[in-house]
UniProtKB/Swiss-Prot annotation:
Protein known as: Digeranylgeranylglycerophospholipid reductase 2
Purpose of the protein: Is involved in the reduction of 2,3-digeranylgeranylglycerophospholipids (unsaturated archaeols) into 2,3-diphytanylglycerophospholipids (saturated archaeols) in the biosynthesis of archaeal membrane lipids. Catalyzes the formation of archaetidic acid (2,3-di-O-phytanyl-sn-glyceryl phosphate) from 2,3-di-O-geranylgeranylglyceryl phosphate (DGGGP) via the hydrogenation of each double bond of the isoprenoid chains.
GO cellular component: membrane
Organism encoding this protein: Methanothermobacter thermautotrophicus (strain ATCC 29096 / DSM 1053 / JCM 10044 / NBRC 100330 / Delta H)
EC id: 1.3.-.-
Lipid metabolism keyword on record: yes
Other remarks in the entry: Reduction reaction proceeds via syn addition of hydrogen for double bonds.
Length: 385
């Protein structure tokens, strides 16, 4: 077998990269380790309207559950604010269905898709990645290619085999657990977030409505906070207090340390969770993965067309994605580090300072004015305002 591009990983990042490479005329092979694309689910499923604007996708009923118009943030000591800021407007997705839709779109654009296919090693020619060794339903196989796009998740081994430093430390990871629940009475248009040591130390708990009495209820906490109690114990207590009925369980890890230092090398690009292209504050990665994967697919097409798959040429991928989302990631990382340092009383005070305010168009300037009477909050936030 021989292809222009082999994409490893069939989730949002991999399928999106495969689609854009294929639509630009490349021969593409997409390898997914699981028997079924979209499972197991490792995502809460919330996206903003900007996801659809930037990807060109339409919020089709095949993979959207509910329209979100507001977000409620609950503090550890009772503070609560609700915002209808345009930035929170979006949809809750049926993630399994989205992943399948994106893989189907890639296939319709011309990509070959193989499930139950685990990439185990890379093939090199003159120091450049030039193929993949994988184990599929028919045994171990080798495939030659012009280049590889690694979208194999937070524990990416492929990028490391190419010489890139992608190993995340335990302190860099957020442990996430989630139930899909039934029989819940929640506002179908409002996402709920809970902060504080009781709910999710160094993280947050979420309730995302899916309509018809269903919701995704989960939490993510930093690994450093898991020494005494695991994330599941916090989630189970919340579930028991509210009497939610569990119908599905999912778990995973998310890198919240910002992107890896380098996302390219000779013959290979890294995208999505494998590259740390995740919002360090929220842990959200669907939108960022799609943005960066589009760039990866386009750069792959440019590289194959020009006959240049060396790292110097492929560095344009990193320059483009950092220009597009780099500043936002840096800002989110600062916010996350500051929030990590807040105790329950400070978190609640911050939320109470915003109660009754018009949050529909809040900006950093207006936030400064709101907090002018809270010197301790200004001290905490001064690095990012």
């Amino acid at each position: 077998m021989k292809y222009d591009v082999v994409v490893i990983g069939g989730r949002v990042a991999g399928s999106t990269a495969a689609y854009h490479a294929a639509r630009l005329g490349l021969s593409v092979l997409l390898l997914e380790r699981n028997p079924e694309i979209g499972t197991p689910v490792q995502c809460a499923g919330g996206v903003s309207d900007s996801f659809f604007k930037s990807t060109g996708l339409k919020p089709l009923p095949e993979f959207t559950c509910t329209r979100i118009r507001a977000a409620a943030v609950n503090g550890p000591l009772g503070a609560r604010i609700v915002t209808e800021n345009p930035v929170v407007r979006g949809y809750i997705l049926e993630r399994k269905s989205l992943d399948k839709y994106l893989a189907l779109r890639a296939a319709e654009a011309g990509a070959d898709v193989l499930t139950m296919s685990i990439a185990g090693d890379l093939i090199f020619r003159e120091g450049s990645v030039s193929g993949v060794v994988f184990r599929g339903p028919d045994g171990v196989q080798e495939v030659e290619c012009g280049m590889v796009i690694a979208a194999d998740g937070v524990q990416s081994s492929i990028a490391r085999k190419a010489g890139l430093e992608t190993g995340f430390r335990p302190a860099d990871l957020c442990s996430c657990v989630q139930y899909e629940v039934a029989g819940v009475d929640v506002d179908p248009e409002t996402m709920e977030f809970y902060f504080g040591s009781r709910f999710a130390p160094s993280g947050y708990l979420w309730v995302f409505p899916k309509g018809e009495g269903r919701a995704n209820v989960g939490l993510g906490i930093r690994r450093k906070s898991c020494s005494e109690r695991g994330p599941l114990s916090y989630l189970n207590r919340f579930m028991e207090e509210r009497g939610f009925k569990r119908i599905e369980f999912n778990a995973g890890a998310v890198p919240v340390c910002g992107p890896i230092e380098r996302t390219f090398t000779d013959g290979l690009l890294v995208v999505g969770d494998a590259a740390g292209q995740v919002d360090p504050l929220t842990g959200g990665g669907i939108h960022l993965a799609a943005e960066c994967a589009k760039i990866a697919g386009e750069v792959a097409a440019e590289a194959i067309e020009s006959g240049r798959v060396d790292g110097r040429f492929l560095s344009r991928y990193e320059m483009r994605w950092r220009k597009k989302i780099g500043k936002n990631l840096e800002r989110s990382l600062k916010f996350r580090k500051i929030l990590d340092g807040l105790g329950d009383e400070e978190l609640d005070a911050l939320l109470r300072s915003l109660e009754g305010k018009d949050l529909s168009s809040i900006s950093k300037i207006s936030l400064l004015r709101i907090l002018k009477d809270y010197p301790s909050m200004l001290r905490i936030l001064r690095d990012i305002l």
